[in-house]
């Protein structure tokens, strides 16, 4: 469901319509049905998409002055302040998600869909690949595994492999996420549905 639909639910009256609503929905989803069974939960966030100032509550307005109003009236410094505030709120959101999963066997993937170019009185993304500056397509990705998940030796070895790749700054791509999610969970596909070459968790025993 869209966050606007979630925000319209009677249980959410008076709450800000932002990404934190998804954390409560995640908790509800895990509690429904077979609470001890397997769950695949996908949270589609607004993150740090423009309008940046609308992505976080006032309590997260750490850097000021902010960009308020239309972006072509905002200075580069104001745009960056609002963007940085939104990133801080994304961090808060991610920690809140992880806090719900620390006592469970869980693995979490996070990926931004694109970056932003911020200039004086303008912000840009979606520039054609051959022309795009690095900040638009080199985006953060994260893989987190709970302590309970890491009790499995194979999971621990896969996570160590991920950490090694991160330390070596091995470049990764969005197109590899499906194969990685399935591979890290231990699924294989003999008919080629899962490309092991794209599996970040792949390691040799």
What are these regions (language model features)?
Residues 57-78, 148-160:
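Flexible internal linker/loop segments at domain or repeat junctions
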Residues 24-31, 66-110, 137, 142-144, ...:
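A long, amphipathic alpha-helix that forms part
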Residues 77-90, 129-139, 150-181, 189-196:
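A short beta-strand-to-alpha-helix junction
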Residues 52-56, 99, 119-123:
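A short acidic (Asp/Glu
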Residues 2-10, 122-128, 157-163:
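Short glycine/proline- and charge-enriched loop/turn segments
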Residues 45, 89-93, 110, 114, ...:
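Catalytic glutamate of the conserved HExxH
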Residues 1-68, 173-204:
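Active-site-proximal alpha/beta segments of enzymes that process anionic O-linked groups
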Residues 106, 111-154, 194, 203:
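Histidine-centered active-site microenvironments of extracellular/periplasmic hydrolases
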């Amino acid at each position: 469901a869209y966050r606007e639909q979630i925000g319209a639910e009677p249980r959410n009256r008076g709450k800000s319509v932002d990404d934190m609503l998804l954390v409560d929905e995640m908790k509800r989803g895990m509690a429904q049905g077979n609470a001890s069974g397997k769950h695949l939960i996908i949270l589609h966030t607004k993150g740090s998409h423009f309008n940046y100032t609308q992505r976080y509550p006032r309590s997260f307005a750490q850097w000021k002055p902010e960009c308020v109003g239309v972006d072509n009236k905002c200075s580069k410094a104001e745009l960056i302040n609002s963007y940085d505030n939104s990133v801080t709120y994304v961090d808060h959101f991610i920690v809140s998600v992880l806090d719900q999963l620390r006592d469970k066997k869980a693995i979490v993937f996070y990926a931004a869909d694109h970056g932003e170019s911020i200039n004086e009185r303008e912000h840009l993304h979606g520039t054609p690949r051959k022309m795009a500056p690095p900040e638009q397509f080199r985006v953060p990705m994260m893989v987190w595994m709970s302590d309970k998940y890491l009790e499995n030796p194979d999971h621990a070895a896969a996570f160590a492999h991920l950490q090694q790749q991160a330390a070596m700054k091995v470049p990764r791509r969005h197109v590899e996420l499906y194969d990685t999610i399935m591979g890290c969970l231990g699924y294989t596909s003999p008919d080629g549905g899962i490309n092991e070459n794209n599996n970040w968790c792949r390691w040799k025993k």
